């Protein structure tokens, strides 16, 4: 790890699957960040043991323990990979001690603005707290935004299917928050008039890769322009999530005014229906390749923090 002044020091709260994978990613590819501390609440955590073996300062006493570590004074960034409820407390505790600390929130708490790197990171480079939405949000919001920049999207519905094995206790405890946060971000970041999110935990063996289906109802538009926009956006996501890909060609259906669809809460709809199918394969840095849902979260969080850190280092 670098010891010069060209990198910002980061701590990770949450020593589970996401936190450990994020630590490995920062160690392998961090340009403007270095990992300085790993924080957990279970002294027997595999993530804490792994961090200690790699020379990272650790504590099993939560954010209170982090504040007592000698390295805390040097930490500029904190990634929170705990739970929505815990993040609210963690942010308040740490911000009281270090008002300028940057929080990258990987829970559905959404204290700060939603951040999807390829869509709106530039607008939030100075934000003290950014929320990475959810795995389903990171995979599908870029596709909604890709269509939104071509045609007005009235309704977006996404179905995120992930392997049961990749869903740890944190994911399972936040199912309601997942659907609520993702739905809101489909509107706020993706540009949809109304958003709906569904998550499916697939128990199949061997475990399946993350699959996401995006259904969009928009005004009539040039299909070629939509296809080009979607392909361009997918390539932009691949820059930081190499395993992200369109599973098949974009599909279109015309909804004539004479035979409109009825969307609960929206009423009758006619125009263009666009269906986009995405697959996310994990990089297998720490997690298995089928856990693309976790990989896209850690990759998006790292891409966000790296851009923020670069702006601080180069200031």
Swiss-Prot record:
Q: Which Gene3D superfamilies match?
A: Dihydrodipicolinate Reductase, domain 2 (3.30.360.10), NAD(P)-binding Rossmann-like Domain (3.40.50.720)
SMART domains in alphabetical order: Semialdhyde_dh (SM00859)
| Sequence positions that bind NAD(+) | 15-18, 166-174, 293
The UniProt entry, under SUPFAM superfamilies, shows: Glyceraldehyde-3-phosphate dehydrogenase-like, C-terminal domain, NAD(P)-binding Rossmann-fold domains
Question: What processes in GO biological process is this protein linked to?
Answer: catabolic process
A Pfam entry, by short name: AcetDehyd-dimer
Which Gene Ontology molecular function entries are recorded, alphabetically? acetaldehyde dehydrogenase (acetylating) activity; NAD binding
Annotated catalysed reactions: acetaldehyde + NAD(+) + CoA = acetyl-CoA + NADH + H(+)
Q: What is this enzyme's EC?
A: 1.2.1.10
- Family as reported in the entry's similarity comment: Belongs to the acetaldehyde dehydrogenase family.
What name appears for this protein in its UniProt entry?
Acetaldehyde dehydrogenase 1
Any idea which UniProt keywords this protein has? Aromatic hydrocarbons catabolism, NAD, Oxidoreductase
Q: Could you name the active-site residues?
A: 135 (acyl-thioester intermediate)
Question: InterPro entries from the xrefs?
Answer: Acetaldehyde_dehydrogenase (IPR003361), Acetylaldehyde_DH_C (IPR015426), NAD(P)-bd_dom_sf (IPR036291), Semialdehyde_DH_NAD-bd (IPR000534)
User: Which NCBIfam families does UniProt cross-reference here?
Assistant: ac_ald_DH_ac (TIGR03215), PRK08300.1 (NF006157)
Q: Which CDD domains match?
A: ALDH_C
Tell me if Thylakoid is a UniProt keyword of this record: no
